[in-house]
Every structure is written in structure tokens, then in C-alpha cells.
Design a protein with these regions (language model features):
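Leucine-rich solenoid repeat scaffolds
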Residues: 153-185
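Intrinsically disordered, low-complexity regulatory segments in ankyrin-centric signaling systems
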Residues: 19-50, 59, 184-186
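Ankyrin repeat structural motif
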Residues: 40-48, 73-81, 106-114, 139-147, ...
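Ankyrin repeat A-helix N-terminal signature
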Residues: 34-39, 67-73, 100-106, 133-139, ...
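Alpha-helical adaptor scaffolds
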Residues: 70, 91-111, 115-116
Length: 186
């Protein structure tokens, strides 16, 4: 009997084994966040369809929509929003995806966020709005697009600066002239 056990154990060890474990079976969280950070839409869709929370944050306390904004992926934003992601979710600094998007010249991303109801007047923990951020970064076309959403031009950050002050401190004369014209109308 002992020889039979040894034989069976030896046979088991010597025969090729075809057991496969997919990375997604062993480390689904890692696969999900890797897909989010690289914008792999099919993988993201699959995870969301299988119940993943579109607002779950990673170790950096960022929800997937922030990565979609950073990499400028409008389709990823649409996918997340179709799975009920929060358009005004905050990062640890109180920034929303719209405030983050104001740094980048991707008007399609901004349009999608606004279409899904992003709060144009949301202020982060420093009191900065998306318009203020766009002015600071000198993104004229982003500033124009955000102005079309009728932001409150009188809001101030917690340093007491409003959009007019920020535009005067900036180097972009087109932004400064545009903001001045709006203030003069009021």
C-alpha cells in the first residue's frame, strides 16, 4: 500500500498540470486599478458590470473618474457615469473631476462633466473653483467653456482672490480681457 501511495504521488508530480489561474482571479483589485490607470475600457466595463463600485477609491484616495480626467479619456468618463459614478466626487483636497479637468485643455472632458451635472461653483478645500483653476493654468479655451456654464464670478478662494484678481495676476491677456468684459457687464 505504501508503494502505491508513493507511485501515485510521483505520478501526480511528474504529469503535466494544466491548472491555470488568471491574474484577475487572484488579484482582481490590481487588475481593475491597472485597467483604470491605463484606460482599458473593456476591462473596466467588465468589472463594473460585475458589480464593482465606480466610486471606489484606490490607495491614493482617487476614484476612477479622476484617472479618466487625467488621461483625457471621455469614453471612460461616459462608462463610469453610466454606472452611476458621482460627477462631483472629491479627492482628498476637495477637488472634483471638473476642477481637475480645468488644468488640461480637453474640452470634450469638460463638456461631458458639465452635461452630467458637475457643479460649476464647487470649491475645493482652498476655495478654488474650476474656473479659478483654468485661469491659473492659463487655459483660455477652457475658461471660455466654463464661462458658458454661468459660474458665480464673485466667489473667492480662501485667500480672498476672485477670478478677476487671478486673471490680473496671470500672463494670459486674452483671459484677462475676457474676464474684465464680464465684470464690466455686471
Amino acid at each position: 500500500m505504501k508503494k502505491a501511495k508513493i507511485f501515485l504521488c510521483s505520478l501526480f508530480l511528474l504529469l503535466p498540470c494544466s491548472v491555470k489561474a488568471l491574474e484577475s482571479d487572484v488579484f482582481p483589485e490590481l487588475v481593475y486599478w491597472s485597467a483604470v490607470r491605463s484606460g482599458e475600457l473593456n476591462k473596466i466595463k467588465s468589472f463594473l458590470q460585475n458589480g464593482y463600485n465606480p466610486d471606489k477609491v484606490d490607495g491614493s484616495k482617487l476614484a476612477p473618474i479622476f484617472y479618466a480626467v487625467k488621461i483625457g479619456n471621455p469614453e471612460m468618463i461616459r462608462i463610469l457615469m453610466s454606472h452611476k459614478a458621482k460627477v462631483d466626487i472629491e479627492d482628498p483636497s476637495g477637488n472634483t473631476p471638473l476642477i481637475l479637468s480645468a488644468r488640461f485643455p480637453n474640452l470634450e472632458v469638460i463638456d461631458i462633466l458639465l452635461d452630467f451635472g458637475a457643479d460649476i461653483n464647487h470649491q475645493n478645500r482652498e476655495g478654488t473653483t474650476a474656473l479659478m483653476r483654468a485661469v491659473e493654468f492659463g487655459n483660455f479655451f477652457v475658461v471660455r467653456r466654463l464661462l458658458d456654464a454661468n459660474p458665480d464670478l464673485l466667489l473667492q478662494d480662501f485667500g480672498g482672490r476672485d477670478v478677476m484678481m487671478l486673471s490680473a495676476q496671470g500672463r494670459n491677456k486674452k483671459i484677462q480681457n475676457t474676464i474684465e468684459k464680464l465684470y464690466n457687464k455686471k
